[in-house]
Amino acid sequence: MAAPRPSPAISVSVSAPAFYAPQKKFGPVVAPKPKVNPFRPGDSEPPPAPGAQRAQMGRVGEIPPPPPEDFPLPPPPLAGDGDDAEGALGGAFPPPPPPIEESFPPAPLEEEIFPSPPPPPEEEGGPEAPIPPPPQPREKVSSIDLEIDSLSSLLDDMTKNDPFKARVSSGYVPPPVATPFSSKSSTKPAAGGTAPLPPWKSPSSSQPLPQVPAPAQSQTQFHVQPQPQPKPQVQLHVQSQTQPVSLANTQPRGPPASSPAPAPKFSPVTPKFTPVASKFSPGAPGGSGSQPNQKLGHPEALSAGTGSPQPPSFTYAQQREKPRVQEKQHPVPPPAQNQNQVRSPGAPGPLTLKEVEELEQLTQQLMQDMEHPQRQNVAVNELCGRCHQPLARAQPAVRALGQLFHIACFTCHQCAQQLQGQQFYSLEGAPYCEGCYTDTLEKCNTCGEPITDRMLRATGKAYHPHCFTCVVCARPLEGTSFIVDQANRPHCVPDYHKQYAPRCSVCSEPIMPEPGRDETVRVVALDKNFHMKCYKCEDCGKPLSIEADDNGCFPLDGHVLCRKCHTARAQT
């Protein structure tokens, strides 16, 4: 690796809200665009520029590889030569973030510029002492837009992530420090050509940040101190073939300077709600600049590769500081009862005058109601159905037969038994118990049991439907014709005729109605009963007519004869 050329004289200025101090104008130089996006996987790594340094990205707790030994360590650049100085920052940059929209305060005047910081002390002694790296030359004019955009995006994100809308006070000026940038995973050659210590041999990261006063030296030294827990850094290439330029955070695009001016210096933006040092504050010699990053403990450092180039340290730190903004503890709101002064009813505490008056009125009203109870106005339908006395609302009552009764009044009409919760029968509008109601029922003439269901009444007597049958054949007579005998017993028609019908004097059979007819037709002659079919002449058997004509009956000596036979017998 070729030795870097001497960097131009740079002075550091400190301003309250600004990140960079204004410098004199220089001629504009077109910067080459980055060819590789270090954050995009798969892009090849650009070749390092002469005099460039490399920062390796690793994981927390991972031992970084030792620095390459195949290149000699160059001596530190000399001050005053700003024409051909090679920057230690790589030329590969990620796409710039969108420009910030909010305005920044004006840049400080040149009278407020502080003298440049002194160079870091060189390594003396054993390998345990920290080795200061060679100074990093300023970036050429082509990277000014990228740095301004990165700082603008950084400030915008910090403002949006602040829950309390923290702003840096305009009167606050942080003390100057020695190194605006700090590299963690790789080292730079020292002035004496001695390699720096590896990260595992670096001093403890818990040391405070030393503040070094700015001596009267015309160049800014960028120190690198390895830490036990390396943070991912970026490779930046800055070529000093052109004149150095300065950045002013008050404008999106800084004008080119015309003459060398003091180098810019970071102003740490410290939120008012956290005392932790900002990620973007410059570190001190000896690796103390990386301690704020270790305190923040960003988890994104674990996922970064160890060999891929990264964007500038301040941009990369902003991307990892977003999820870990330290928030201020929200004050606990006072309880609701403290905010509302109205006391809830029943809560302990002194009573107001209005509450005391209301309590006295309620007490007097209660005493009056107890001394003079009012009679309840009972409606007409709330009278007892038997005693016709009013029913109190709190008194239990029985609703039956469409009326209300006192429990003592709802009893059987015959035996005075209480009927509450029991089965009762209504007879002529009066309640009866089951026993008394059964006694009032008619009994069957056949079986002698009370008729509780259907009743059949015949010949002036009551019967169960299944008990009203023929006394001869026991066939039910419900719905059919029946005949009663002299003893008032029911008979079916066939059985009655068989038993009580007159018999024919010819065939000696009972004279019964013909099938399908209810009437019985018989012929009576000579005090004898005849069927219609049996009414004939005894001698010739000729059917006789019931009419008094020549075809009628001409009796003779007790015989039924026709006229011809009658004449014949009479002549003999």
Curated annotation (Swiss-Prot):
The modification N6-acetyllysine is found at K265, K272, K279. Residues 240-252, 305-318 have a biased composition (Polar residues). It is found in: Cytoplasm; Cytoplasm, Cytoskeleton; Nucleus; Cell junction, Focal adhesion. The modification Asymmetric dimethylarginine is found at R253. The modification N-acetylalanine is found at A2. Disulfide bonds: none annotated. Residues 143-156, 202-239 have a biased composition (Low complexity). This is Zyxin.
